[in-house]
Amino acid sequence: MKTGLWCTSAALAVSLSLLAASSASAEDSFYATAAAPYKGTTIRVLDEITPLQETLSKIVPEFEKETGIKVEWELLNHFEVINKGQADMLSGRGYYDAVMLHGFQVGPMLSAGAIKPVDDLVKNPKLDNPKLDTADFIPGPYKSLAFANGKQLGFVNWNYNQVYWARADLLNNPEEQAAFKAKYGYELAPAKTIEQMRDIAEFFTRKKGEKLAGKPLESDFYGIVLEGIKGGSTFGTLWRDFIKNYGGDIMDAEGHPTFDRPENVEALKMWAALWKFAPPGIAEYSLVDVPTVMGKGIAAQTLAWSDFVLGVDKPGGSPYAGQFVYGPIPVKAGATTPRSAEAEPSITVITAGSKHPEATFLFMQWLVDKKQQEKLIELGQGGVPVRETSWAMPAIKDSSNPTLYAAMKSTLDVGTAKPRMPKFYEVYDQLSGIAQEVGLGKLSPEEGAKKGQAEMLKLCDKCLL
């Protein structure tokens, strides 16, 4: 009797095991099944090259193996991916089936009709993965970027975000701590307010021969480094890390320019003050140069894109790897307005000229699928999450660099895509130039605010899509 009961139980266990395996296999084969009609198709996808995409490139071949769809995945630098991708999209020729767009590109591309919405593909049960779990996407970036005018454009692929980045070895040095407290009256620590960031910048700006952490400097040292080129993300930093944290903005809710408001003038004053403590070449620094300067140990602190940090703060990435600390973007002391932090969630969209939208849509889903996102984080020994569940992965939760991920999460908790502006590039070009002129002292903050308002009004009275 006991033997018979054991056999029955064993058979039941085997059946349940096979059923579970069959269920798991069915789930794993969704993309293979959905892709069957498109086997042998070749799609071309254009993306940006950062440490994140370099890691992802290792698993893209798995999609080809699973589906039989060939992916020609081209990676270009930040500026090239913008220029080449937009040129193809605006031409309508559809050389690329999908192009990665930064959030600020979406407005101009939408107004040009260069993006194919994915609503019809999402509604197709043969193509839409019912277990994609879009509710798991970090909501601010996803909801502000992937939808427009009642239509879905895609999913969030990259949650680029800025963090506060400083030299922990300097902030924790007892001599520097004592000297800082004697001068400013409070403890030296990672800046939580913009005013503290300014004090730290002033304090650590030293000339060659002066001592830093007890040792004579062989060259000048700077209290801060910021992006300063005309273009790149210079104005984005000023706008959403400074102006908005001062309670200002460049437009009102209806899109009417408000660049000359008093809060913006105050933010510009702080912006100009910080440039005095930066390296003399700041006006030529791009978003790529900022992490390079930090990695070489030339400056004490910065506001930088966290994905570039991943390539610097690691063994072999910098002589100072392991000696950095990170924090949320500092806010204005006593601010009562909502906290702001610069982020650039980015999306892979199907081009209006794509000849293979179905196969491309399957690849887009596969990229953001939880399984692939887990692999991406694991292979990269960290990364920048697009899903909430990624924060709990061991590579992040148990990271040797916990302050970096806490800082990332702080930004992504409030980070959103930029407002949809058809004339974003024209507006950005003007305001980026003004940001540089104010930083260099060629314009006073008041003059900069006045000029910015006038230039915006020349371009648009209502600047939103």
Walk through the language-model features, giving the residues of each.
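Hinge/lid segment of periplasmic solute-binding proteins
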Residues: E27-P37, G103-V163, A213-D220, F235, ...
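Short, polar/charged alpha-helical segment
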Residues: S29-P37, I49-V71, D169, L431, ...
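Long, aromatic- and glycine/proline-rich binding clefts that accommodate carbohydrate-like moieties
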Residues: Y31, K39, G322-V331, E378-E437, ...
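Short, solvent-exposed loop/beta-turn-alpha elements that line the ligand-binding surface or hinge
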Residues: T33-G40, D120-D136, N173, A178-K183, ...
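Short, well-ordered beta-strand elements
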Residues: K39-T50, I69-E74, D97-A98, I224
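Extracytoplasmic "Venus flytrap"/periplasmic binding protein-like
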Residues: K58-F137, G154, P174-E175, V293, ...
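Extracytoplasmic/periplasmic substrate-recognition and gating elements
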Residues: G150, L170, V265, K269, ...
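Glycine-centered hinge/linker elements that transmit conformational signals in sensory
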Residues: Q196-T205, L238-E284, I329
